[in-house]
A protein has these predicted regions:
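Conserved phosphate/anionic-ligand binding catalytic regions in large, soluble enzymes, centered on
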Residues: 114-123
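C-terminal nucleotide
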Residues: 1-112, 127-166
Length: 166
């Protein structure tokens, strides 16, 4: 995986708490994507970008839940990809290998793709048709090789009703 500074997640936590204190809210959930710009002058550019990611991500989660109930998982692609762009641009939680894996997945027909894991550690998931799996694996492996990166590991997962306790 991608090596991250051990303090990455704790730094983002501190940044988030500073924004909460500066804005006088209990949580960034108290803000909406429409209300956040009203507070821009109270925050540094970096703090604003961090808050923007969190506030918009909260909205994306709500939108994703609605889409899953109404349309199905294939419709999540745009939200996943927007989430990744925000993680990369506003939260600084990406790396060239991650971007390459996502760009390659999208170019090979993935509905969407996003980094997952605490601290941006380098795991990416892509929402694809199962028929495209082999082509996607070959394409990502080839792109990594072409750029001098170690071959990534691939884990195939599928949808389920959720974790079950037996």
């Amino acid at each position: 995986g991608i090596e991250r500074d051990a303090d990455f997640a704790s730094k983002r936590y501190v940044e988030r708490e500073e924004v909460v204190d500066l804005l006088g809210v209990t949580s960034l959930r108290d803000l909406s994507p429409k209300s956040l710009p009203d507070h821009r002058d109270k925050l540094s550019e970096t703090s604003y970008r961090r808050a923007q990611h969190i506030v918009n991500e909260n909205q994306r989660v709500l939108d994703a839940a609605k889409i899953l109930r109404q349309e199905g998982p294939e419709s999540l692609g745009e939200i996943l990809t927007a989430s990744q762009a925000s993680l990369r641009d506003d939260y600084d939680a990406s790396a060239r290998e991650i971007d390459l894996a996502i760009e390659t997945a999208l170019s090979q027909g993935a509905f969407g793709a996003r980094i997952v894991g605490v601290g941006g550690s380098g795991s990416v998931y892509a929402l694809i048709n199962s028929d495209d799996l082999s082509l996607l694996q070959v394409s990502v492996d080839g792109a990594f090789s072409e750029h001098g990166f170690a071959a990534p590991s691939t884990y195939v997962v599928g949808p389920s009703r959720g974790a079950l306790r037996h």
